[in-house]
Amino acid sequence: MSVVNNRVALKHLVSMEHLTNEEVMGLISRGSEYKAGKVAIKDNSRHFAANLFFENSTRTHKSFEVAENKLGLRVLDFNADTSAVNKGETLYDTVLTMSALGTEICVIRHPEDDYYQQLIDSPTITASIVNGGDGSGQHPSQCLLDLLTIYEEFGHFDGLKIAIAGDLTHSRVAKSNMQILKRLGAELYFYGPEQWYSSEFDSYGRYMAIDHIIDQLDVLMLLRVQHERHDGSQSFSKEDYHRQFGLTEERYRRLKDSAIIMHPAPVNRDVEIADHLVEAPKARIVAQMANGVFVRMAIIEAILNGRNENV
C-alpha cells in the first residue's frame, strides 16, 4: 500500500486497521474529487469486477455497482441464491473460480468474521479483495464514506465530539469508525443498551448516557438495531428502545445548530430515529448514501493502481 502525490495504491481493502492515516485522507480526498467531477475517467473496459454478496444489501451492493460502472469496469453478475453455493461450494472456491476467470476485484460481503483472511493469504487467488462487510467485524467502505461526510462538514476530525449510538457489539460500522476516528483525533462517546456494549471499546472512547452529552456533540452517528444477530434475551420493544436510546424530537432540539446526524442505513424508523427526523436539516443520511458511490470509486481506483504497480 502506498500514497504518492495523493495517488493511493492498495492490494486489498479488508480493514481500516490496515490503512495509514495518509491513505485514509488520500481516499477521502479522491472521493471528493470524483464528487466534484475533477477526475478524468480512464478506459477501464478491460478490467472485471465481481460483487459477491452473501448477506442482504442495498446501499453497499448497488453503490459499488454504480461506482464500477462509472469507472467503466465490466461487472460480473452474481447471485448467491442461484450460484454453486447452493450445491455446497465454499466461499474460497467461489472466489478461486472468479479469480481463475480473470476477475481482478472481488467485492465481498459475508456473515463470517474475518472471512477474507483465507483469500488474501492464498497463493492461488490473484483477485484483489474488497471487504463489503464481514459479520460483526469490519466495514471499511462504509467507514470511508462516513469520514468523507464528516470531513465535508467540518474540514477536520481533530477535537470533534462524536457519539456512536446503539447496537455497538454487533456493528461492523461502529468498529471500523471508532478505530480510525480515534486515530484522527476525534473525541468519542458511546451509548446504547449496556448488553450491547463491550469493554473492548473503552480504549477508543467513553460510555455515557446520551442525555449527558447530546448538547455538546458535533456528530451523532446512529446504528441500526441488528435484530438478525440477536437472541431473544436481547430484545426491546420498538417503543422502549426509541424512548431510552433513540433520537427523539426532544433530543434533536438539544443538538447544537452545527451538529449533524448520521446513520449507515437501513433505518428502523421510530426506533433509532424518529420517522420525521430522517430527512431533517441536521440529518446527513442521504448525503452518506450519495458519498458512498464516490468513495467506492476512489477505492476501486486505488485497487487498480495497486495491481498496476505489481504488474
UniProtKB/Swiss-Prot annotation:
GO BP terms, alphabetized: 'de novo' pyrimidine nucleobase biosynthetic process; 'de novo' UMP biosynthetic process; amino acid metabolic process
Positions with a binding annotation for L-aspartate: 87, 172, 224
Entry's family note: Belongs to the aspartate/ornithine carbamoyltransferase superfamily. ATCase family.
Pfam family, one: OTCace_N
Protein's job: Catalyzes the condensation of carbamoyl phosphate and aspartate to form carbamoyl aspartate and inorganic phosphate, the committed step in the de novo pyrimidine nucleotide biosynthesis pathway.
Stored SUPFAM superfamilies: Aspartate/ornithine carbamoyltransferase
Protein's name in the database: Aspartate carbamoyltransferase catalytic subunit
Family annotation (NCBIfam families): asp_carb_tr, PRK00856.1
Catalysed conversion reaction: carbamoyl phosphate + L-aspartate = N-carbamoyl-L-aspartate + phosphate + H(+)
Annotated positions binding carbamoyl phosphate: 59-60, 109, 139, 142, 265-266
Gene3D superfamilies: Aspartate/ornithine carbamoyltransferase (3.40.50.1370)
Pathway: Pyrimidine metabolism; UMP biosynthesis via de novo pathway; (S)-dihydroorotate from bicarbonate: step 2/3
Top EC category: transferase
Gene Ontology CC: one annotated term: cytosol
InterPro entries: Asp/Orn_carbamoyltranf_P-bd (IPR006132), Asp/Orn_carbamoylTrfase (IPR006130), Asp/Orn_carbamoylTrfase_sf (IPR036901), Asp_carbamoyltransf (IPR002082), Asp_carbamoyltransf_Asp/Orn-bd (IPR006131)
Keyword presence, Metal-binding: no
GO MF entries: amino acid binding; aspartate carbamoyltransferase activity
Keyword list, A-Z: Pyrimidine biosynthesis, Transferase
EC number: 2.1.3.2
Assembly information from the UniProt record: Heterododecamer (2C3:3R2) of six catalytic PyrB chains organized as two trimers (C3), and six regulatory PyrI chains organized as three dimers (R2).
Keyword Plastid part of the UniProt annotation: no
